[in-house]
């Protein structure tokens, strides 16, 4: 049922166009450069809740940030990855951390790939470069999956059903 007010130009209709390029193009096409903030919601943000958007908008305004990114914690430390070499072997990517217990490594976060808030003037000027005044809201890992592959969609469906069950049973 949704209507599309415009289509991307051929130049921006490829697998190499960044989200930022598409958002800037959209802002210009709808002549909304004078709006203070814009929000980009990804179509794969199926676990995003209204409260996430409301809290994100409130936080970017209150903190006077230039960008707001929803983040979540890694379920494992990205500082202890293994990489393949040859056809049968793996090794630590970072020898510095190979003897460090994962619980002793700093907690790191990644964006959820669900939505972003931008101060319009900064977005148009920086063209996607992350400004120093970037804030965040924390999203529970159970409510986020960056959907890029068919397996990611299966995981998101499992998460959705789990969240639905938790809500139904009041847990």
Give residue spans per PLM region.
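A short acidic, often aromatic-flanked loop/helix-cap motif at beta-alpha or helix-coil junctions
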Residues: 11-15, 76-77, 142-145
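Hydrophobic helical membrane-anchoring modules
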Residues: 136-138, 143-171
């Amino acid at each position: 049922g949704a209507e599309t007010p415009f289509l991307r130009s051929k130049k921006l209709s490829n697998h190499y166009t960044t989200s930022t390029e598409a958002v800037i193009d959209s802002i210009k096409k709808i002549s909304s450069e004078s709006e203070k903030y814009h929000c980009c919601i990804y179509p794969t943000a199926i676990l995003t809740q209204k409260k996430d958007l409301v809290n994100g908008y409130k936080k970017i305004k209150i903190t006077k940030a230039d960008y707001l990114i929803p983040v979540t914690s890694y379920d494992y430390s990205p500082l202890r990855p293994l990489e393949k070499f040859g056809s049968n072997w793996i090794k630590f990517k970072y020898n510095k951390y190979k003897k460090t217990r994962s619980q002793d490594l700093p907690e790191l976060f990644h964006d959820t790939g669900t939505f972003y808030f931008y101060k319009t003037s900064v977005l148009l000027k920086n063209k996607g470069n992350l400004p120093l005044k970037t804030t965040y809201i924390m999203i529970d890992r159970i409510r986020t999956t960056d959907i890029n592959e068919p397996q990611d969609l299966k995981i998101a469906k499992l998460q959705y059903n789990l969240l639905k069950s938790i809500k139904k049973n009041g847990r």
